[in-house]
Amino acid sequence: MQEIEPSYQWENIYEASKDRKSPFFGRSYSQTEYEHDIYGYYIHPNWDEIDSETLYCKILFTDYEAKFTIIELFGEWNDTLHNDIMHLKRNVIDHLLAEGIKYFTLVGENVFNFHGSIEDDYYSEWFEEVEDGWITGINFAEFVEKEWEKYHIDYYINFGGNLNLPQWRTLKPELIFLSINHIISHRLGAV
């Protein structure tokens, strides 16, 4: 797992550690010291810790003017044992909401498992706080999406179908946002 790095193709235009509005502002990254692990397996040091034992993230891009962010996730999303949505919501999302972000894209190709909970308070709260924005998940494994459906996470997070963008790394973040916004608008019948 230590070889799986967060995407870095946009570091020339955005780095969360250099963004004063980011919850990870001022963070420094060692390329030689591995300090975090998931179930005893060390993970790459560029992933940001959110106080979860099994879920990490990386804010890849945020545009405060257009009010969107793209966040890559890594690990096991475990709401059953660790209430990971609480950690993600309180330690990352709330900071971005306070800065006016209302469009959230979660990249999930490195989320290896999801364990849901009947409690959906944090999802519901987040959904209500984006008001006329949206929350979307792209490139999550099909079995993760099925678990999301089982626990009704699809009430709050848009995912699946044409929201899976396997070529996302080759696109500029603005184009990803515009594409997803168009898809969501079409799904809601606004186009």
Model segments located where?
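STAS-typified acidic loop motif
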Residues: 42-88
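Flexible, charged surface loops at secondary-structure boundaries
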Residues: 63-65, 96-99, 130
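A contiguous binding-surface segment within folded domains or other stable secondary-structure elements
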Residues: 73-121
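Amphipathic alpha-helical interaction surfaces in cytosolic regulatory modules
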Residues: 101-104, 108-152
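N-terminal catalytic cores of peptidoglycan-degrading enzymes
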Residues: 1-48
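A cross-taxonomic marker for long C-terminal extensions/tails that follow the last structured domain
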Residues: 4-11, 143-191
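Charged, low-complexity, helix/coiled-coil-prone segments
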Residues: 23-41, 61-75, 162-180
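Short, low-complexity, polar/charged sequence segments that are solvent-exposed and flexible
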Residues: 89-94, 123-126, 154-158
